[in-house]
Amino acid sequence: MKNKVVVVTGVPGVGGTTVTQKAMDILSEEGLNYKMVNFGSAMFDVANEEGLASDRDQMRKLDPETQKRIQKMAGRKIAEMAKESPVAVDTHSTVKTPKGYLPGLPAWVLTELNPDIVIVVETDGDEILMRRLSDESRKRDLETTASIEEHQFMNRAAAMSYGVLTGATVKIVKNKNGLVDKAVEELISVLR
């Protein structure tokens, strides 16, 4: 029997991983145990095993065909996990590459995952820019507020297309500065 598959997306620095992890912790205390899977980590495991990337941020620079092959392999691994328990897939709706936006969940991954819900975590572009500038643990390309907002627009468009292709609902969750608990509660209400 298929368990619920929820995809949580957002641009780098929006706080999607933080919001999702906090929600998972609260739901676990209530007895609802999702397996949280980071799609980028699953892809990195494949890329690293093949000697293609030594850190996650290098994967964005791989050629599109290599990225697509890695996505497909990671999607298969995650789909197998959903047979055992509900899964929350932490990923990006789109990945900004030097050659344009790459869908984070192309048709071959969507077919495997068949998500029930696609969640897009967002906030204002200037808040994301400030978060990125203060995060010294990642090697991110410098972007403007306008380019971050364009990326968020592309994420919404991609999320809706994922919903059209799978029948999944699409939910926007706002993660404003200082209001992470509100974002967590909104996410929990969708995951229950």
Curated annotation (Swiss-Prot):
Enzyme class of the recorded protein, top EC level: transferase
EC id: 2.7.4.3
Domain of life: Archaea
Subcellular location: Cytoplasm
Keywords: ATP-binding, Cytoplasm, Kinase, Nucleotide-binding, Transferase
Gene Ontology cellular component annotations, sorted alphabetically: cytoplasm
Residues given in the record as ATP binding sites: G10, V11, P12, G13, V14, G15, G16, T17, T18
Catalytic reaction(s) noted: AMP + ATP = 2 ADP
Recorded GO MF terms: adenylate kinase activity; ATP binding
TM annotation in the entry: none
A Pfam family per the record: AAA_17
InterPro entries linked: Adenylate_kinase_AdkA (IPR023477), P-loop_NTPase (IPR027417)
Subunit structure: Monomer.
Family, as annotated: Belongs to the archaeal adenylate kinase family.
Name this protein carries in UniProt: Adenylate kinase
Origin species: Methanococcus maripaludis (strain C6 / ATCC BAA-1332)
